Amino acid sequence: QGAIEIASQAGDEWIASLTRLTMGASLMLASRYEAAEDWLNRAVLGFQECSDPFGRTAARLWLCYGWHKQKQVERLERTLTEVLAACRENDYGFLFTTRSHLGAPDERIFVPLLVLARDRGWEGAYALRLLESLGLGGVQSHPGFRLSVETLGSFQVRRGSEAIPSNGWRREKSRQLFQLLLTYHQSPLDRDQICEHLWPEADPATAQRNFKI
């Protein structure tokens, strides 16, 4: 807030709008959608006053992200179509495909928007092209994050930039099963082999029952 006041007093609407965009994006990522939308709408107006189509497009993209997370698909058609058109016409596609200061901290968070646009025909050909540049042209759905695994040293799984804690797994055996399948990813295991690895001391009937739970 202080940065905006200083920028406004100096007559620098662009810096003020940039700060509003950054605040709005941060609030969107924190799932504080109502507050985020207020900041972003003000950023859109500010960038419009400054004749900055890039900033305006970035702010509107974050609005689309929030509407999609809230399943307000009816609000998306016009704005997402216009955002994609602006990206196509001005080479702003990197907002969807790479990490950037005004875009995503994880480029996968906007993939669900691209899948929706492709399927609904909202700049569908361009949305498909962006998906293909990510190697995701054929996906039918996407969670909106990249899953990364660290196996050297302590085992760690990250959902986007967020590390999943040990207690974040519903069951400890789920974590162990994931590790097992990762270890033997080139050698498919059948159910009996998995049960032997996870419950070596259990009789077959008990192991089978544990596997189903």
Regions found by a protein language model. Give the residues of each.
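Tetratricopeptide repeat
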Residues: 2-3, 36, 40-43, 59, ...
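Intrinsically disordered, low-complexity protein-interaction/activation regions
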Residues: 18, 123-213
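TPR/TPR-like alpha-solenoid helical repeat scaffolds
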Residues: 19, 58-61, 93-117, 127-135
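TPR/TPR-like (Sel1-like) alpha-helical repeat modules
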Residues: 74-92, 111-122
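Alpha-solenoid helical repeat architecture
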Residues: 1, 7-23, 34, 47-62, ...
